[in-house]
Amino acid sequence: APLSGFYGVR
């Protein structure tokens, strides 16, 4: 699951 921001998934 990605973060609440933008770079949750890198």
From Swiss-Prot:
Annotated positions of the Arginine amide modification: 10
Summary of the function given for this chain in its UniProt record: Myoactive peptide. Stimulates the contraction of the oviduct and foregut.
Subcellular location: Secreted
GO cellular component, one term: extracellular region
Organism encoding this protein: Locusta migratoria
Keywords assigned by UniProt, alphabetized: Amidation, Neuropeptide, Secreted
Major subcellular site: secreted
Name listed for the protein in its UniProt record: Locustatachykinin-2
Keyword Glycosyltransferase attributed: no
GO terms for biological process, alphabetical: neuropeptide signaling pathway
Record keyword Endoplasmic reticulum present: no
